[in-house]
């Protein structure tokens, strides 16, 4: 009976120790979330089919380091004008970038926005930028009626 009394007396301390260890392990497992290398949102604003359309590409990253990115558009039919412009910018965690293109077409067109992570000096502050090992080209496609 005496040994049973000692077992019940030590139990709350052991339970508290196990609880603390479990909470510590759970917290360590939560810190292993993966960051999004690049998030892209492509919007096409068009009032009427005979008028000019504006293509807006918003690019953001969850990385702590900055990257030099080059953004451009591709299409299934040739389009003239500033559609062919390429934008180079520094993409950092707290500063998403928005790129704008104006285009005019009379038919349905599939537009692909491409963002390349490149190595170029003089774009990011103090030339501090990273290049991902896994992937350096990202794209998103939409149709413009």
Swiss-Prot record:
GO CC annotation terms, alphabetical: extracellular space
Annotated glycosylation sites: 106
Disulfide-linked positions: 66-92, 90-124
Segment forming the signal sequence: 1-28
Subcellular location: Secreted
GO molecular function per UniProt: aspartic-type endopeptidase activity
Residue(s) carrying Pyrrolidone carboxylic acid: 29
Keywords for this protein: Disulfide bond, Glycoprotein, Pyrrolidone carboxylic acid, Secreted, Signal
Family matches, as Pfam families: SVA (PF05326)
GO BP: any one term: regulation of immune system process
Quaternary structure and partners: Monomer. Interacts with AZGP1.
Stated name of the protein: Prolactin-inducible protein homolog
Source organism of this protein record: Bos taurus (Bovine)
